[in-house]
Amino acid sequence: MTEVNKPPRPGGWTSFVTARPRLSLLVALVITALAVLAGSGVADRLGSGGWEDPDAQSTYATKALEREFPDSQPNFMLLLDAGRATVDDPAVVAEAERLTARLAAEKGVTGVGSYWQADPAQAPALRAEDGHEALIAAHITGDEKAMGETLDRIAPSYRGAHGPVEVRIGGLVAVRHEMQTIIQEDLTRAELIALPVTLVLLVMVFGSAVAALLPLGIGIVAILGTNAVLRGLTEFTDVSVFAMNLTTALGLGLAIDYALFIVRRFREELSTGAEPLTAVATTLRTAGRTVLFSALTVAVSLAAMLIFPQYFLRSFAYAGIAVVLLAAAAALILLPAALVLLGHRVDSLDLRRLFRRGRTARTSGEQGSAWARAATLVMRRAPVFAVATTAVLIVLGLPFLGVKFGTADDRQLPSGAESHVVQQHIRDGFPGSPGGGLEVLAEGRATPAQYTAYKEQIAGLPGVQRVDGPLVKGRSAYFTVLPKGEAVDDTAQRLVGELRAAHAPFDTKVTGTAAVLVDSKHAIAERLPWAAAVIAVVTLLLVFLLTGSVLIPIQAVVLNALSLTAMFGAVVWVFQDGHLSGLLGFTSPGSIETTLPVLMFCVAFGLSMDYGVFLLSRIKEEYDRTGDHNTAVRHGLQRTGGLITAAAVILAVVMVAIGTSRVTNTKMLGLGIALAVLMDAMIVRSLLVPAVMKLTGRATWWAPGPLKRFHQRFGVSETDGERNPLRGAGDRATSHDGPADIDGDGSAHESGGVRAVR
């Protein structure tokens, strides 16, 4: 046996993983059980907010107003509907006053006011224009958990019929509490959808039920472990309930990606006659390196969200980093231990044979030939495919040029949700209602004349409809400014800047929905270049370590970004502009929440790099083996095209299951990421990457001398570490000279369509 083909002996990490496989699995089972206990009840400790910048002026003003003037920040509403009567009917007035007094006596409730007890200047804002509805407004105190507990305690006794009125519950506390409940319910349903469908697809990919169960096991371990991590983090910081959706999606999706890659390589080694232990050793030295490398690239993309101040984004970074690293750890520790124990039995329970009924199974040669023909066609017409696919992606992304950013409000909820119905009634029938305007907090001593002069000054601003106040308490006061038009339209956002620029003899700070939006946009715009730079620089470095090329990392960043254009265009066209809203079952708010594009970019870019690493590692391996650029690109696509497509389809299924959520942001995240991974796998990896690499030719692999030496010392590749006599001394070589074919008996192969691993 030559040095190149000599099987590696288990050692180091491989020995650690495989020396006692039963013990490894037992320890993993115990740790998983502990994670279940540690992560139990995590959903109840997660928040449903986090879109605002905690260091912004609007956040400071909101907290100060809640502390000094709780009635200025109503977050709990009772909508009283008098039916055919009016809200001024004596019987309605009596019942409304009784409910107002009762609510004012509730523990944890302050700042209670109502139409029936308000002063003449404020009363019209609490009465519907048609006279049949009116509001009781209040402020529930405490953090999100305390507010939720108060709401659970008092809401049931107010909801429903009370004499001549029907009462419904709304306000920010009700919206967020209902959103949290719906997300938890939808996540459970998504898991019930995704798990069986994923299992069926895995059986189609692997053929063997035993092999198909391995990725699911890895995914479940990663999800349970991440829930425990999130539960621990809630002791130190705020964590968003939305992060649980990413935990499920990436836990299943990446675990399946990594398991596909490792099991495929393991079966290939078995097909060459290697013993299970030797096959695992080679698998960890080759595919294992690529899996670890891929996990690092995905984790870096997700870690970029830690740069932003909003805990909504930071929560996805916490969950994403944890689930990616746990999925990789499980794939590199538990999966090899299971493969050592299973050996050739990994192909047991071949369920596809039940449906063949005498038909001949497709061989790897037949399956791989389809990808080989596709690769040959793409490279023969490289300029056409490069221009055409780029043009298609750019056109699909054009709607994003019309993006409008807004805030997350009750319109995230399904149309029948009680708190959404109440807020919609308020928007439609209560001009100047509480929470629809801007508040100006004034701090510092001032005379009545100074307050009056300031009020007249801001009342003269072009975007102002009305100014109420001031309400003075000690050294503080506040004014309520009602803007013309919608609460968060361009006029309201310009007014925020004008109010902040207005001269005053005291310190002023502006808050309100439009102010929160302005501050959130500023925080994201200020930190976005840093996040993009972190992702780009680290990606360039990691891809260079993988390939040793200067050009390929640049191609990877540019093509990855290009692959996301379709996702962003679709998000605006569907969720902002409202196309397909009836079919998909959501209410379009006419804008995109400011943090969503950042979140979707980081997640989708990381997943694109995941597939990019799989493809590039194989192309690099072929180039090291043959020194022929065109052959390397063609064989790389031939050997990984089916694998990447299968992984993308399965991940898309999981994301679509998440996208069945009734909460619009979650639906947008799920369906948007599903589209992104499919476009990346089927267009960018299959068409655009090989076309561009064909056009760049051998220059693709160029690097200056110092960088070549750096890569030779620190580079990573999917090889077993042996030198290839066919290449220069500085190149690494694979232990294989070509793909492993099968004869339909369940042995492994590397290429094909959905059956790529069979």
Regions inferred by a protein language model and the residue ranges of each:
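A general boundary/transition motif marking the beginning of the first structured unit of a protein
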Residues: 5, 53, 87, 326, ...
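Loop-to-helix "switch" segment enriched in basic
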Residues: 46-50
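Membrane-embedded transmembrane helical bundles of large multi-pass transporters/channels
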Residues: 1-45, 109, 142-405, 515-758
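Structured non-transmembrane domains adjacent to transmembrane bundles in polytopic membrane proteins
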Residues: 54-76, 83-176, 402-583, 591, ...
